């Protein structure tokens, strides 16, 4: 009997070990690509639209322009409809024993980098002084993450818990990017329905891919009045910091010991669902999904 239970216990241990291996978070792999996860929830859809790599982006953009024009003519306030919160989809850029670095798959909203060109020119080398950094670590974080989820997030080198990627990261082959001009397209990102119809994110024409320009967390090295951004080809360029239609593609770091995988297979269509766990009990905490 003892031997039988020992064999059963061994089998269970092997099963759990295999399950953990299958659910292991890792960074980009040249052969296997990215691991995808969901964590937190944010306004993304209105009429149930999904980004679909820009298939609907141009339609949302033209629809919003038409509706805004009609509202202005009728002297009414533009009303795109009620936005719905959906799980935020992230790429796992890198993962080790200290942190899991996540980059939003989509542009989640549009915003100025900073409202004062003079202030940005003088202090823009410090991303934390910008209006956008304050929005990411204030309004956005409060809307997107529960207290338990925020507790699982790490502060990145004085940037706060929510930040933007920089050019070094978006040129790093270890994270799936490249410095080669022919690979600029890898940096393209598409905006959500909410980002386009509600916050006014710009959409490049269909011939260019229907994607959206988005900010990096850096000041331009050639014109300090401007911020670095991703342009129509996916190249790293610069734009005036008061541009209201440039997108934000948030990034976060998570504590590996403060999260757990609950479902999914890690693909873009079936991402792992990450949930925060209690330090005391090791059990899942309340998430934004449960608070909805």
Regions found by a protein language model. Give the residues of each.
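Bacterial N-terminal signal peptides that target proteins for export
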Residues: 1-7
């Amino acid at each position: 009997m003892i031997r039988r239970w020992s064999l059963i216990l061994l089998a269970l241990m092997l099963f759990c070990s295999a399950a953990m291996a299958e659910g292991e978070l890792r960074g980009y792999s040249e052969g296997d690509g990215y691991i995808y996860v969901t964590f937190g929830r944010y306004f993304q859809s209105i009429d149930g639209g999904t980004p679909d790599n820009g298939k609907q982006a141009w339609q949302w953009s033209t629809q919003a322009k038409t509706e805004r024009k009609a509202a202005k003519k009728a002297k009414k306030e533009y009303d795109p409809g009620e936005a719905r919160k959906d799980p935020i989809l992230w790429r796992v850029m890198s993962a080790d024993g200290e942190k899991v670095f996540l980059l939003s798959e989509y542009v989640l909203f549009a915003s100025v980098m900073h409202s004062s060109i003079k202030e940005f020119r003088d202090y823009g080398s410090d991303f934390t002084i910008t209006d956008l950094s304050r929005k990411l670590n204030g309004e956005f974080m409060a809307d997107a993450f529960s207290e338990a989820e925020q507790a699982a997030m790490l502060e990145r080198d004085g940037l706060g818990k929510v930040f933007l990627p920089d050019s070094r990261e978006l040129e790093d082959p270890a994270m799936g990017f490249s410095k080669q001009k022919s690979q600029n397209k890898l940096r393209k990102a598409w905006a959500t329905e909410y980002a386009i119809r509600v916050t006014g994110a710009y959409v490049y024409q269909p011939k260019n891919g229907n994607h959206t320009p988005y900010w990096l967390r850096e000041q331009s090295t050639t014109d300090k009045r401007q911020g670095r951004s991703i342009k129509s080809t996916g190249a790293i360029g610069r734009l005036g910091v008061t541009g209201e239609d440039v997108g934000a593609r948030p990034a976060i770091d998570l504590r590996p010991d403060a999260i757990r995988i609950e479902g999914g297979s890690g693909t873009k269509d079936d991402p792992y669902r990450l949930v925060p766990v209690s330090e005391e009990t090791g059990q899942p905490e309340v998430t934004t999904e449960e608070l909805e």
